[in-house]
Amino acid sequence: MSNNIFTNNYTIVDKLSEGTYGIVYKVEHIESKKNFACKKFVIDNNFTYCNYNELIAHNEFNHSNLIEIYDILVDYGHDKCTYYVIMELCDGCLFDILFCDKVFLDESQRLDYLIQIIDGLEYMWSKGFVHNDLSLTNILVKNNKIKIADFGFMYNRFIKQDIYHRNTIYIQPPELISGHPRICDPNKIDTWALGQIFYVMCYNSVLYNYSNKTDYYLDIISKTNTPSLDIIDKLYLSDKYKKLYYNIFRKNIKKLTQNAINELVCYNKSTNKFSNDNLRKKTSSNKFIKKHMNWSVRHRPDIKQSRKLFYEILANKYPIYNSPIIQSIIPSTISFREFSFHKLWSSMNNYDYLFKSNLLFGIHFEYKIRLHHRFDYQYNLIVKIMLLMGKIIRSCFSKYNKFKCLNKFIYPNNNYLLSSQISRLENSFDRFYSMGKIIYCHYPFFENYIFDYDTIKLSNSLEFQYHFIDILDKEIPCLDAYDIFLLSNCNKMYQKYFKYMYYLFVSSPNATVFDNNIVYQSIMLIIISYKNSLIYKKLINQFLKLNISTKIKYSREINHCFNDDIINVIEIDNDYGINLNYFTVDTIITAYYIIHICRLITNEKYNLLNINFAIESKFIKYLDKLVSVIDME
């Protein structure tokens, strides 16, 4: 570097890396003696897209998970300018940590890194940009803090590109590899890469790393999932490709020639990487990875949806007391927002299908089950089994799996052949509870056989729970709304109300559809409404609007007016200890649905539960009033 404004202030210590658009040095500030990273690039008449993006990043970004740019120095020459971008110096990149240093990250560290990457990408997304080059070398680490760097390939997500810059091949989605940007969604490029990055953090190996398209496509199919024929057509893949790969994975053997099968066998022998045992494991982390590496751009998550999928990893992590808990400061006040009719109506369209199903689990109200609500451990297992059963029954009703999963857990009884499918399903739930009762009666030192003589002997509750999951090929949701309540700083004087309301809520199979945090907030809203007369009146008003919204069909029957989404805001003192600033429209609708569940429960079952949970008559009368409101025609 020549003598200029840069050398007057900094001394080069070491060369860190060199790329197409610049060189990165480790430098020392002469006056303060502090070390920084410096990226040097030259701009002449051919001012490049990548150079311009680096300058945008300096002006637009300010986030703890994006590399901080402290200063930009410019040395003006005769026919060119040399830029020196002074940045914070990091300890290294993920590539160095995972492959050079061969560090294996434990689960808590992986999840911590993952949520930091999501935070950084979501911040860029909120500013209108996608990174577009999220490789291992561009994710830096400083004191265990993720720093996303190198913004040269980023795009404005609101602008459809005719041509996308090619980045590192293993992080490119199929639509870019195939050279068809017209089906590319800028919002989904980073999330494909995010799935790849998280795979490397989990297994210390790169999932896809081929130099040609044919091997790359086969690798995607053999290690993750098979694309639909529609997707293959959109990518203009050859007929030979469709015949060889698509049909094999769809098991349409009759359509295959022996030559095609031999060709695939030769590929297996030559690469020895046809399958991937890591992704065959049914874990929450693998589910996250596979969802992000979806061939279909439409079904691939964007960064907002990635955050929700991250929380599903936490929700399904076992056991609960090892799950990372995101702490927040409890605000001194809570805002209750009154939403306009148009906002409630438009949001209600997302929930409309739930109100068409009036299924309840009858066994949930039987005496032998109601006995187990007194202790948190017993109550927790009951509601978790209910949530698991909800997942199963929804799986039974889905158009792809209708009743196919019944053979996993149905057992014969005297009326088995005479029963309907739903009756068989509910009769089988009795067995779930009897399995759970083993823990109730013998925990923590029980010795029993599960599923009679042909199953294994268990010695502790965690082993029981593991095999319970394994037998059913499902996951028990462990971080549910009640767990969130227990782990929060909410005033525990409201615990009995919360337990009671949540017990009512999980009697519906649809309980598994709702976000656990929203359910927690909605039940707390119902409790706050019981204690605060002003909130009660406002909540009733919102429910009345929702009554009307359920009766109005989509778009044509409603007068679209350009009114505000929020028409009023009321602040109350946060004497409840809830870690929330305000209630969202989803919280209002979920509270409405919880009261809808109460409405479906017969008076007989309702009264039995009231006695078991020792709920005072005043609270019951309050719920009756809410039920009467949503029962209006």
Swiss-Prot record:
UniProt similarity note: Belongs to the protein kinase superfamily. Ser/Thr protein kinase family.
Protein name in UniProt: Putative serine/threonine-protein kinase L232
Catalyzed chemical reaction(s): L-seryl-[protein] + ATP = O-phospho-L-seryl-[protein] + ADP + H(+); L-threonyl-[protein] + ATP = O-phospho-L-threonyl-[protein] + ADP + H(+)
GO molecular function, a single term: ATP binding
Keywords assigned: ATP-binding, Kinase, Nucleotide-binding, Serine/threonine-protein kinase, Transferase
UniProt KW DNA-binding keyword: no
Domain of life: Viruses
InterPro entries reported for this sequence: CDK, Kinase-like_dom_sf, Prot_kinase_dom, Tyr_kinase_AS
Protein species of origin: Acanthamoeba polyphaga mimivirus (APMV)
One Pfam family linked to the record: Pkinase
CDD domains documented for this protein: PKc
Active site per UniProt: D133 (proton acceptor)
Chain residues that bind ATP: L16, S17, E18, G19, T20, Y21, G22, I23, V24, K39
The keyword Nucleotide-binding is annotated on this UniProt entry: yes
Domain Protein kinase: 10-314
Enzyme Commission code(s) on record: 2.7.11.1
